[in-house]
UniProtKB/Swiss-Prot annotation:
Residues 138-179 form a coiled coil. Disulfide bonds: none annotated. CDD domains: NSP3_rotavirus. Residues 229-238 have a biased composition (Basic residues). This is Non-structural protein 3. InterPro entries: Rotavirus_NSP3. It comes from Rotavirus X (strain RVX/Human/China/NADRV-J19/1997/GXP[X]) (RV ADRV-N). The keyword Coiled coil applies. It is found in: Host cytoplasm. Belongs to the rotavirus NSP3 family. The lineage of its organism: Viruses, Riboviria, Orthornavirae, Duplornaviricota, Resentoviricetes. Residues 224-248 are annotated as: Disordered. GO terms for biological process: regulation of translation. GO terms for cellular component: host cell cytoplasm.
C-alpha cells in the first residue's frame, strides 16, 4: 500500500515536472521521508491487518482508535497534497483501475487495489456489504488474552521460585565444599596424630625393654614390672603397674591417651 502511494506521487511528479533527474530525486526523498517517519510501516501494517485479521493483535480499544485516527489524518494529508498537484478524486479513483483481458478477447476493467475492488462491487451490486467481525470474536480474544496473562503471571512466579531454589542449592554447595575442606583437614590431622602415636608407642616399648618392664598396648597402654623378678612372700603373684613422673604427678594417664588416637 505504501508503495502504491509512492508510485502515485512519482507518476504525478513526472507528469507535472517532467521525467528528469530532479523528479526522480524528489520521489526518492519522499520514499525516504515516509520510511523515516514511520508512515510507510504504518500503512503496510494496517493494510496487512485489514486483509488478514481485520483488527491488529495486542491492541487495546483506545490504541486502535488512536491508530485509526492517525492513519486517517495521514491519508487525508496525502490526498490534500495530491489535490494541490491536480490529483483529484476522479484521477485517484481511475488510477486504481487497469485495463485487462478476460482470456476470451474481451477488454475488462481490473481493480488494482482493495478499495477499487469494493468500488467495482458497488457499481453493479447495491446490496454489497463488507463482512463484519464474527460475533464473539473480540470477547473470545479478550478472554484468551486474560488467560495468557494469568499463565504468564504463574510462569513468572515459578521462575522466581526456581531462582530462589537455585540460590539455596548454591548455598548448600558452598557449605558442602567448606565441610569437605574441614574433613580433609581433620583427616590429615588424624593421620599425623596416628604417626605420632605409633612413634611414641615404639619409643615407650624401647624404654620398657631397656629398663626391664613389660608394656601392653591394646586399647590402652599398661606398663608393669617384668615377670622375671621373684615372687614376694605372703603376697599373690601379680604384676604391679608402674607409675612415672615425680611424686604426685602421674604420667600413666597421659601415656594412655596416646592409644586413643584413631
Amino acid at each position: 500500500m505504501a508503495e502504491l502511494v509512492c508510485d502515485a506521487l512519482a507518476t504525478l511528479t513526472r507528469n507535472t515536472y517532467g521525467d528528469n533527474d530532479e523528479s526522480a530525486k524528489f520521489c526518492r526523498m519522499f520514499r525516504t521521508m515516509i520510511r523515516d517517519s514511520g508512515l510507510y510501516g504504518n500503512i503496510e501494517n494496517w493494510r496487512a491487518a485489514f486483509y488478514r485479521e481485520r483488527l491488529p493483535k495486542r491492541m487495546s480499544h483506545s490504541t486502535v482508535s488512536i491508530q485509526l485516527d492517525n492513519l486517517e489524518r495521514e491519508v487525508l494529508k496525502i490526498r490534500a497534497e495530491g489535490f494541490c498537484q491536480g490529483y483529484t478524486r476522479k484521477e485517484r479513483t481511475l488510477n486504481a483501475f487497469d485495463l485487462s483481458d478476460d482470456g476470451k478477447g474481451n477488454t475488462i476493467i481490473k481493480p488494482t487495489t482493495h478499495l477499487s475492488s469494493i468500488i467495482l462491487q458497488n457499481s453493479y451490486n447495491s446490496a454489497f456489504k463488507l463482512p463484519k467481525i464474527p460475533d464473539g470474536l473480540l470477547e473470545k480474544t479478550r478472554y484468551e488474552l486474560e488467560e495468557e496473562k494469568k499463565n504468564n503471571d504463574i510462569l513468572k512466579q515459578k521462575i522466581k521460585e526456581l531462582e530462589n531454589t537455585i540460590s539455596q542449592l548454591e548455598n548448600y554447595e558452598n557449605e558442602a565444599k567448606a565441610s569437605q575442606f574441614v574433613l580433609e583437614h581433620l583427616k590429615f590431622t588424624n593421620e599425623s596424630l596416628k604417626i605420632q602415636r605409633d612413634e611414641a608407642q615404639i619409643c615407650l616399648i624401647g624404654l620398657c625393654n631397656k629398663f626391664g618392664l613389660q608394656c601392653e598396648i591394646d586399647n590402652s597402654i599398661h606398663v608393669t614390672e617384668s615377670d622375671k623378678k621373684g615372687k614376694r612372700k605372703g603376697r599373690k603373684n601379680r604384676r604391679i603397674e608402674v607409675s612415672f613422673g615425680a611424686p604426685g604427678h602421674d604420667l600413666t594417664e597421659q601415656i594412655s591417651t596416646l592409644s586413643d588416637v584413631e
